[in-house]
Amino acid sequence: MWFFGASVVLTSCKKDDDSDDTIIPPAETPGTVVVTSNITANTTWEAGTIYQLAGRITVTNGVTLTIEPGTIVKGEAGTGANATALLVARGGKLNANGTATAPIIFTSVADELDYADMAAGNFASPNLESTVNGLWGGVIILGKAPISASNDVGDVSEVQIEGIPTSDSNGLYGGNDAADNSGTIRYISIRHGGANIGSGNEINGLTLGGVGNGTIIENVEVVGNQDDGIEWFGGSVNVSN
């Protein structure tokens, strides 16, 4: 285990730098940037600023969100279909490359973790027990890799991911590109999340829908999640820890 003082709850259920990047500069330390709308241009979130998700925030098709090592992201409270989440739509990318000494933390606004804690090497929440859950949604990554799904008509190549209303077409996943690339994720911790919307309809700590094997996912920690830690819906991605 690479985080000290945090217990891990992890279950699963099989069901380049661009010159046009938008750089969000740090506010006064510790500083908070409230993210209220979808990410529609290449964007970098920098360590030293807390990024606060004010709802379901989508990295749209053709766009890359880069998160620097050691960055803190916090989700506002939300329940059911309105649960706060970071959603990477098909064709979007999340490059979140943390390290063992500078992990990227996704947690709740109720978590008092700050950059002073991180600088001291204290990565665990200073105020929330590791069993506290359901305070926000989670991270959802969707791709174009093959899936096994059907509806009333028969077999289909794309479906809506659970936890996202059908009115949001960014929730579609699946396709025929096994090598699809949704980015790189290393050394991230997802904490105190999960949302149960209905029977068989949840937001997990990390949801992977039709994610291709061009995507790299390594060393993911899920702490205190209401539903599954990581849940796969088809796809061909390999995940290692």
What label would you give each PLM region?
Residues 14-241:
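Beta-strand/loop edge motif enriched in small/polar residues
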Residues 9-12:
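C-terminal motif of bacterial Sec signal peptides marking the signal peptidase cleavage site
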Residues 1-7:
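Sec-dependent N-terminal signal peptides
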